[in-house]
A protein has these predicted regions:
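Generic "edge-of-domain/loop-turn" microfeature
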Residues: 16, 90, 135, 306-308, ...
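Extreme N-terminal leader/anchor segments
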Residues: 43-48
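Active-site-adjacent loops and short helices of periplasmic peptidoglycan-processing enzymes
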Residues: 30-41, 52-229, 238, 303
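Hydrophobic alpha-helical membrane-insertion segments, chiefly the h-region
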Residues: 15-27
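Penicillin-recognizing serine hydrolase domain
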Residues: 7-9, 28-38, 68-82, 178-336
């Protein structure tokens, strides 16, 4: 009887063990679907890993900060004697001192129109040799350090006008274009005179009726003048001119001349990322300075598909033209 009871207990234990093993085997597949929902690259990840991934996603989707530039107190007085802000999209002056037909002296801003006219008669890759025309350059004026015998392409001479504001480059282009107009080897002075006639005729045809040019570089003459209305027209022409805009925003470049390497630095500080006056929305154009014109600047700005032209003239110091321009640009954005 005792053996029978032990046998029954043994059978019950075997059945119980079998049931337990079966239950375990049956429960395992229920875990598989949950495991399949976990991506392979996150298997075994922790809450810390998940938080790190969320932070990384937020960082990659965050927009970069808005570019900044030098700003000034609202009550800062402009130093320029004459100035304007022009909206090229609405074709209107947003700010202007005096009237749009008031006569002003453009100084080296003249070189924008010199480039515009000259490159109509000269191919960009035309090789030009500096010669006697350099004798016509005013002593002590800004130059690109060109000497007689230097050879440079016409396009490179445009750069020489726009970066270091080379009056020597302006005369070389004027001479070359003047000769191309007549297809004759006239002397340097005659060639430049012919070019100046063409500059004035083109200004007239373009509606720049308040403008008269005497020389290709902007050295002061009482009869060398323009107006705000005509400068707007000039600025628009410059923005659309490939030869001008190719170099208008180049901060500096080292070039090789006969005398050795020369560094050309752009006189427009607004386009130089290393300069404290740098503005990421400034795209060019040209500075100027004479005793009568003061320190001046015609600038183009582009932001969010819009274009502005800003001119400041008669500034007492070189720095004033950049500070006034930035102040006017900031105020224009705030007024939108």
């Amino acid at each position: 009887m005792k053996k029978l009871m032990l046998l029954e207990i043994g059978v019950l234990l075997v059945i119980l063990i079998a049931l337990i093993i079966g239950a375990i085997g049956f429960a395992k597949p229920a875990m598989a679907p949950a495991e399949l929902d976990v991506p392979a690259d996150t298997a075994g990840s922790t809450n810390a890993d998940s938080q790190a991934r969320q932070e990384q996603t937020q960082q990659t989707t965050t927009q970069p900060p808005e570019p900044t530039w030098m700003t000034f107190p609202e009550d800062r007085a402009l130093k320029a004697q004459q100035y304007f802000v022009y909206d090229c999209d609405t074709d209107e002056f947003l700010t202007i001192s005096g009237t749009q037909d008031e006569r002003i002296y453009p100084a080296s801003i003249t070189k924008l129109f010199t480039a515009f006219v000259a490159m109509q008669y000269i191919e960009p890759e035309t090789q030009i040799t500096a010669g006697d025309v350099l004798d016509l350059v005013a002593w002590g004026s800004s130059v690109a350090e060109l000497e007689k015998g230097d050879v440079m392409t016409a396009e490179k001479l445009v750069e020489a006008m726009l970066l270091p504001s080379g009056n020597d480059a302006a005369y070389l282009l004027a001479e070359q274009a003047g000769r191309a107009m007549t297809n004759q080897e006239v002397d340097a002075q005659t060639a430049v005179a012919l070019f100046m006639e063409e500059m004035n005729e083109q200004a007239e045809r373009l509606g720049m009726t308040g403008t008269h040019f005497v020389n290709p570089d902007g050295i002061h003459e009482d009869t060398h003048y323009t107006t705000f209305a005509d400068l707007v027209q000039l600025g628009k022409l410059a923005i659309e001119n490939e030869s001008v805009m190719k170099y208008a925003s180049v901060p500096k470049e080292t070039v090789q001349l006969q005398a050795g390497s020369v560094l050309w630095e752009n006189t427009n500080a607004l386009i130089d990322p290393q300069n404290k006056y740098y503005c990421p929305y400034a795209v060019g154009l040209k500075t100027g300075q004479t005793p009568m014109a003061g320190s001046c600047l015609l600038s183009a700005f582009q932001k969010d598909g819009k274009t502005w032209l800003i001119g400041v003239f008669g500034c007492p110091e070189i720095e004033d033209r950049f500070e006034d321009t930035l102040q006017l640009f900031t105020q224009s954005l705030a007024g939108e």
